[in-house]
């Protein structure tokens, strides 16, 4: 609205005042049975929702764009907007319009954002939806990153002195919404296409003192140390920002949040986002989810909670032996007992997402159907318990009575059943209270069963059987008066009445009161008719009012069960996770691996689970692999398409599966526990940030060399490509040396390369061992055997692969001629490859000859003085150079060099 706009009506003045408080949100403004949007909000909503855009005051000079949606169907429209990244502020009528004096009071009751969604329409069932907050204090040289799944109440975080590490965790956790101080800018290299960034005032959101107070209040603790937050100032600030944002958007207490647990990196195998992407754990290399990922092969869970737990385990595998052993024991049990596993899957399949259901109930955001879903889920608890309690035999059968005498439950089941809670009291309450198919909206009524509440029963009887009660009263009057011609009627003026012909009207008792005289009839009422009429007219309203009151009481009672519900949700998720791993192992014919504290990794007939799932078992060639003290770095050579990358990836995936407690795709596996797995596989240009494949490769390699330890597993594929042959060879050589020098005995590494010169490192550098992917030549063609065998590959077969790829025959033939000439030349000169363009050029007819120097005098050899800029570069202390100082030095050099001055 501009300054010269006409005076606002009271309603628009109210709207504008509320809108001013939420300028970045679409304001859904309740007016009667509709939510209305005005001005720019209306234009955006109409465009995104494909609904009609109209205008208020169409005949006025200043028309107001508007659109609206019915309140009973607004949820789907709002969900669409939230999915598109919009914030939506819900402005409700805060009083009954019929009782309002003047303008109805209105206020925003909630702001919906992509990171605070509670509705199923905005949530992925088997994935967490995170709201994140990141802060970085340059003066302290430290920062914090915290995240919360508001739909379940789980939250965690970490603190680091490396800003890059924090952003790596942001990429790994991939929050739907990320809170950043308005002074902080994300790095240009950050790839988060599905994350919405929300800038907030640093002082209001990230203040340490306020954050500490909010955390202790929300978690009901007296000190931060109770949550593991002592001496973690930056993590406290990040957590405080989350709580501030949630309080402002949700407009209520945050008592549903679980106890905060800082992420303990020492307990988990660390997989950064780059490794997740290269190994295609959750997404394919093209960014798509589903088929072609490890998740698609592994996920056999049947509940949303079990699916989310599997995702969490796959993102954070265990590094400790104890939880791995317990998971393996459970998976082995369900793997061996097929009948139990099948029946358990059937029982769990009736369980809804009780984690998220309990959150919606606790926050008063649940619909009646959510309560019915909770009831249905609680009904499954005794059935699941009985399945687990039934003794099993070793061959997968239920034990006979005689066999049960010596049968004992596995320790993991005994511990679980000891704390089992059927929640029978809450199931029985919900069963007694709610009908089987209640309406979606509370205000529609018809929620409760007959017999739940006596007063409600009477109102239900009146509202549902009013017509029959009127008919019964009429029959009774006809019988007692003996006048069969009495009729029952109704109109807006007099309501219900008895109509009697004038000829018999005098026969009516005095208890009947005349209401209206017609030409041939008289209309009467009676005390009983008036009483019944009053009850009928008010029954529907009274029933809705009473149902609302009873429903609120039911909500408060069920909300108290949240801790018990969450405890059982965790048990059910764990059961589902275990049986899902067992189902996957049965389906794909996997085996139980042996994990140990040593360094050896021994895999017999290992398979890549995703490739095998696509090709089928018959089409996949398994491979053996061994890493030990004498074979720390396997140098794998062979042509493209032979399967080097598959061997690398499958080794890493088998280690990851083993450390979540899963069976693995192999005939046998012994895995020395890993602390980190690094993967540098595949080309990954980052053109948007001006980073070539080679630059990205070098950055990832540098990170690996800095962070890998003796307990890490590193897989590297084609290090050094993307630059000149000898540059690439030199870099690959140096990387191998560095990997074997680090951590005394070297880092466990699988190193695939086309640089055959590197094969000479076996015997030169302890721990380097040559392997190759076998090839067979047959009738001038090559056959990929897909077998990993000892020794180096004899050559790269690049021309043969080009032929298989469909390169035109004339190009292939010419390539063979050139290759033969190059090889002859290199043998004659005693070198592996031509050392320069001048050596290679005469072998390539059609290329211009280099300038002739035969008749020229031999050039005088003069050593020029070292340029001052090179001297300055050598003297530069890069370890202690600040970014500002570096920029200043570069500017000075550019000024000198750009001017063409000889002195530089």
Curated annotation (Swiss-Prot):
GO terms for molecular function: ATP binding; ATP-dependent DNA damage sensor activity; damaged DNA binding; mismatched DNA binding. ATP binds at residues 638-645. The keyword Nucleotide-binding applies. The gene is mutS. The keyword ATP-binding applies. One of its GO terms (biological process) is mismatch repair. This protein is involved in the repair of mismatches in DNA. It is possible that it carries out the mismatch recognition step. This protein has a weak ATPase activity. This is DNA mismatch repair protein MutS. Residues 825-869 are annotated as: Disordered. InterPro entries: DNA_mismatch_repair_MutS, DNA_mismatch_repair_MutS-lik_N, DNA_mismatch_repair_MutS/MSH, DNA_mismatch_repair_MutS_C, DNA_mismatch_repair_MutS_clamp, DNA_mismatch_repair_MutS_core, DNA_mismatch_repair_MutS_N, DNA_mismatch_repair_MutS_sf. GO terms for cellular component: cytosol. Belongs to the DNA mismatch repair MutS family. Keywords: ATP-binding, DNA damage, DNA repair, DNA-binding, Nucleotide-binding. SMART domains: MUTSac, MUTSd. It comes from Oleidesulfovibrio alaskensis (strain ATCC BAA-1058 / DSM 17464 / G20) (Desulfovibrio alaskensis).
